Amino acid sequence: MVKRLLAWVSILLFAVFSLYPIVYVISVSLRGDNAFQTQSLEIVGPNSTLKNFVSLFTETDFLLWLKNSLIISGVTTFAGVALASCSAYALSRYRFRGRNMMLFSLLTTQMFPATMLMLPFFIILSQLHLIDSFWGLFIIYSSTALPFCIWQMKAYYDTIPRELEEAALLDGCSRWMIFTKIILPVSSPALVITALFSFMSSWSEYVIAAVVLQDPQLYTLPLGLRSFQASLATQWGLYAAGALIVSIPVLILFISISRYLVSGLTMGSVKG
Amino acid sequence: MRYYLFLLITLCSMAAHAEKLRIHVWHQMIYGHRQVLAEVLKEFEKQNPDITVQATYRETEELRSGYQSAAMGGSGPELVYGPSDQIGPFATMGIIRPLDEVLGVDYFKQFDPLAAPTFNGKHFAIGDAVGNHLMLIYNKKLLPVPPKNSDELIEMGKKATIDKNGDGRVDQWGLVFNYTEPFFFAPFIPAFGDDFIKDDVKPNLNTPALANTFQFILDMRDKYKIIPKECDYETANALFKDNKAAMLINGDWSWGDYKEAKVDFGIARIPMISGTGKWPASLVGTKGYSLNVNMKSPQHQEAAVKLLMYLTSTPVQLQFAEKVGILPSNLDARDSDIVKNNPLLKISADIMEVGHPMPIVPEVRAIWDSLRIQYQKVLAGSLTPQAGAQGAQVLAEKQIAEMNEVLKPDAGAYVLKAIFALVILGGIWMSRKSLVAFVKGFQGPNRFAYYMMLPAFIGIFAVIVYPFFYNIAISFSNFSLRTFQDWSLVGFTHYVNAFSDPKFYSLFLKTVIWTVVNVFFHVTLGVFLAVIINQVMPFQGFWRALLIIPWAVPQYITALTWRAMFNQEYGPINIVLQKFLHLSPIQWLSQPTTAFAACIITNVWLGFPFMMIVALGGLQSISHSLYEAARLDGATSWQRFRHITWPLLMPVMVPAALLGSIWTFNNLNVIWLVSNSGEPGDQTHILVSYVYKAAFNLYRYGYAAAVSVIIFLILVIWGLGMLKSQYQKETK
């Protein structure tokens, strides 16, 4: 009984811990003009207003940023899932020269401080005339998330019994058909996770986008939000309102697939 | 035929018309100014129908680094607008053009000399306004007359610092300002007797004047208690706007804000220092337009120059003066009634009289940085004012030397080139069989696998592997401020420097602590919560979704939110500590240990959901029969955890923890955003944030690349070791 009570207390504590910052952002976004500074802990104070949300949509280019972000994240997610699922399948099912080397080098790509790749990125992209174009971002975003996604997918494929494919091979299926008709459908938890990671890496990325996209017509949500923060006078209300709206799609995504998340992230390592 | 010709000509002219010249301007104007800019640009486009102007806002630091990389890549905006102190670095790098060639020498005579600064004898920018200087702004309701000297400042400050309801908390402050930032503190230094920069370039920091200034601020904070213990720009601004501060030190850019908040304010010089009889000298600068060296065509250049002349012309400046109250740089504009009849601008001009021009040489950046580091250490109590002043001089000289260093290729360069050649040849020789096998693989039985992998690996190669090798090359080069355009391989110097610097080892130690503490909490909290959710809680899905939230919110939003929550005065964390736990408030962000702790708390918040999900997955794959059997054998719950859960969870948690450690080790976002790039005094850095600062703030690209290669090697060696020991355990 005592144990049960302790469990409840600690889970409630952590629920507060994980929710509070969000509540705080909500409360800031609801405050009127002057700002995030108040010494009360009220979430919805007497002066609360939805003004910030209204002006976010009417006075800023928020909808444009939203559209750009959706395009970029959509393409990145699609490309990321396609690339990761194919190459991970090869790494899982085939034994060939350099396979271990490849797996290890995928892991090592995570070890280099990513910010230092900025300078070379920029030089390469400007030589290819990909500055101020979504193509540059498509390429960078879908590739940077790849190493983790490939590892993830491979671990999952490893748990799928080979017998499934062998039967189909005997029936005369091509390898490509086996992959698309048998393997992909049973890998949905892992595919969902790969999609999630690809999506997240582009949805909230800021540093690279800031360099690649120079035309405000092409701004993504993080870039747009950042423009509310002048060096010395941040429009906290607008920023908070925008931050909330940026987080909501990811939140919904996470919550709706949290079931897949559990099996997708761990299946491989448990049985593999 | 004629008809077709006509059509052709019309089409051509339409096409020509459709192809308007597009001129880009990057600027860092604050919100109110941006609106005026938009208006005047609209007017310009009306006057010049063949030109469209694209104005892009960038935050000051970002404008600087973004412009640097853009110009280096041969592109970038035609015009760049910013404070005069960016002229020095940009001109040194050779990425902005001397304006004398395009505008003629006499053009500059129409401006206030402050607005047309020269660097190496040439003009690189024209300012559209003069000012940017600090002054004392006072709330007339709380303080009818401003103090004239520092004694009065302290007296009046004491009177205006009030705890209204007697709860031990000050409700109204005598003076507020962003005093941890050297820019806001610099005006006092000359008032105590000595400038902090000599001959425009040399740091002059080891002076009694600097030590006394340190002491003066400390006294205001600790002895007279008229300024808050912790006060950043936002806090000072908010207190003043809420009528909770009698006096404020801020610049001319802030007036609009206070007018809008309906504060009845007056402005005055920062009070004279009574002991010396000298006035604090604010740094007076200009913000202006510079011309990119890279132009797409002569037409672009012509249009950009036209735009530049328009934006600095009298009517445009007057429009700015009228709407946002800036002091025009154009001498004609300054004579107009709009300026003359504006009381604020008049006082402002008077304050500027005791001001000093803002130095624009690149070295200033190193001086500011050293000053900031030492000053914040003094404020945190880890250095005495004297030691702080002494240390600032040493540090500034060191940083200037590093920044200006142009390494010459030494013997190492030849060794290096030889090694590179050998590695490449050796690599080809060693892998020749693999290469052949690889090429043949496209026809062999495994060709399906090859085609499946090819697209992903092309992507990874282009985006990660190639830039990575590029970086290795930079790490052996002299790429820095003075060799921005043409760098060359020089040898091992950066590596030798990195390893012989004691700072490297202390940073490494701190990074290890950061990683271990974070990953420890991530894993233990993750497993703890997973066990509870899995065994005790009803509605598992609900709790799981609830606790996943921190993971779902984009990191940069999280980090800034937590920074606001740690605010000493307004952050909910301190308010809870005081109101409910009756503890004294913690100065989270101005003490090195608490600031580091704040970063860790933020990162723990960010990271535990991932581990929890992984642990949940692991737990759910453990068969229930094991627990039932154990229960039958009479095992306690601890024994069940110790002998069933833990060992079966290990294979899941170890790889996750491994990956988690790598991510944490390289996590720049949290440290950078929560501690505001390493504050206080550069004492919250971990290796990656230190690298970032060296590269993008201090122009030491080569050195930064070398340290990042070292970070990589550390992680690879450690990762290999972990994998190996794990492998051995599994095969036992």
Where would I find each of the regions flagged by the language model?
Chain B
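Glycine-centered hinge/linker elements that transmit conformational signals in sensory
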Residues: 156-158, 200-230
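Conserved C-terminal helix/tail region of periplasmic/extracytoplasmic solute-binding proteins
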Residues: 222, 353-426
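Long, aromatic- and glycine/proline-rich binding clefts that accommodate carbohydrate-like moieties
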Residues: 268, 321-373, 377
